[in-house]
Amino acid sequence: MKKVKITAIRKVQYDDLMARYENPIAHTCDVCEGQSWISEEGKCPDGLCPEAWKTMREFVEALARGEGNFYDGWMKNPRSAMISCNDGFRPVSFYIEAIEQV
């Protein structure tokens, strides 16, 4: 299986939506832009947000198996994907790419 690199590319926060719709929460996202993890054998890397993993898992597993070219040419690099976590108030965009043959 291939190793898959997961990189946080962009993190945004919609303060207007948070003020209007969200109840205050004690802990928010710790992910920083540029932070990266390596998935081995299609498994969730230590330290990656479990909720973010839920949105990217199928893509990471497919890339680890050597698959790619999602949605018939969606990405310039067919062995990659751009996935966002499901937090509508402070989403993080992750670039996922197969990096090595094991």
Language-model regions, residue ranges each:
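A short, structured loop/turn motif at beta-sheet edges
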Residues: 1-5, 30-33, 101
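Short, structured beta-strand/loop micro-motifs enriched in basic residues and often containing a Trp
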Residues: 2, 13-22
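Beta-strand secondary-structure signal
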Residues: 3-7, 93-95
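Beta-strand elements of well-folded, non-transmembrane domains
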Residues: 10-12, 100
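Short, charged beta-turn/beta-strand-edge "cap" motif at the junction between a beta-strand
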Residues: 13, 41-47
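Short, flexible N-terminal segments of the mature chain
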Residues: 19-43
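Short, conserved turn/kink motifs that form compact alpha/beta structural patches or helix kinks used as
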Residues: 34, 46-64
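Short, compact, well-ordered microdomains
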Residues: 58-102
